[in-house]
Amino acid sequence: MCPCPHSQAQGETDGEAEWHNAALDFTHAMSYGDYLKLDKVLDAQFPLSPDHNEMLFIIQHQTSELWMKLMLHELRAAREHVKSGKLGPALKMLARVSRIFDQLVHAWAVLATMTPTEYNTIRPYLGQSSGFQSYQYREIEFILGNKNATLLKPHAHRAELLAALEQALHTPSLYDEAIRLMAAQGLPVSQERLARDAAAGTCYEASVEAAWRQVYQAPERYWDLYQLAEKLIDLEDSFRQWRFRHVTTVERIIGFKPGTGGTEGVGYLRSMLDTILFPELWRLRSNL
């Protein structure tokens, strides 16, 4: 026990001062580690190379997948709330998704401590595995409206994952539901847009911009839709920053070498920067 006179408050016993009455016996109770299943989580890192730096590479990607799991949890629920017209909860969930993207943006700085020399040591052990094959990331893209049936192919060897992604492909996106909600409130969205195949993905449609323009020109009248539009812009803004930081991190580590999954690496990632999730919301800013 530390003899320092400042180590305990007046009137406390030595035991109380040291442990602050914290529970210490978990023989018949659930502990922190039990609740979080830390035995499983912390036993899921299996480096294939002898290199010290591979642990960083694994944990960077595993933690990203955990954040994406939470993102999907929020996006699925937000989509259902938008579908039912309950925008209050949806706005909170979308704000949380934006903050998750911010968290992932900052996380790239940790991976960026890996040098090209260090990465080249572990690269031969990675085979063809690549973040391009992340099924959670693919579902996030599908929920946000960036859909392409070709991207189901990397998951054909996992029947349960393929089925889940096929369902996500054919389910209306979050943005589809926002557009339907505008139409339900009497805003001028074309029937062609409302009847469009959900698997086709988002593309610009003039009537949707016209509807959003009415929302922005009368925010007091359409306050909930106005707030929804701004939350969608926040989300895509954060998503774009995450993508840009991804490109920069990959370029500083591997340069312009091909990616492990067979893509052009940085060239492929740069092409993804041109993807626009909610095109009408961006274009109307030039036309207000």
Swiss-Prot record:
Binding-site list for heme: 246
Any one GO molecular-function label of the UniProt entry: heme binding
Keywords: Dioxygenase, Heme, Iron, Metal-binding, Oxidoreductase, Tryptophan catabolism
Pathway info: Amino-acid degradation; L-tryptophan degradation via kynurenine pathway; L-kynurenine from L-tryptophan: step 1/2
Domain of life: Bacteria
Keyword Transmembrane applies: no
GO biological process: L-tryptophan catabolic process to acetyl-CoA; L-tryptophan catabolic process to kynurenine
Binding residues for substrate: 57-61, 119, 123, 260
Cofactor binding note: Binds 1 heme group per subunit.
Gene3D superfamilies in the record: 1.20.58.480
UniProt cross-references to InterPro entries, sorted A to Z: Trp/Indoleamine_2_3_dOase-like, Trp_2-3-dOase_bac, Trp_2_3_dOase
Iron listed as a keyword: yes
E.C. number: 1.13.11.11
Reactions catalysed, as given in the entry: L-tryptophan + O2 = N-formyl-L-kynurenine
Cofactor (UniProt): heme
Record family assignment: Belongs to the tryptophan 2,3-dioxygenase family.
Summary of subunit composition and partner proteins: Homotetramer.
Task of the protein: Heme-dependent dioxygenase that catalyzes the oxidative cleavage of the L-tryptophan (L-Trp) pyrrole ring and converts L-tryptophan to N-formyl-L-kynurenine. Catalyzes the oxidative cleavage of the indole moiety.
Name this polypeptide is given: Tryptophan 2,3-dioxygenase
Organism: Pseudomonas aeruginosa (strain ATCC 15692 / DSM 22644 / CIP 104116 / JCM 14847 / LMG 12228 / 1C / PRS 101 / PAO1)
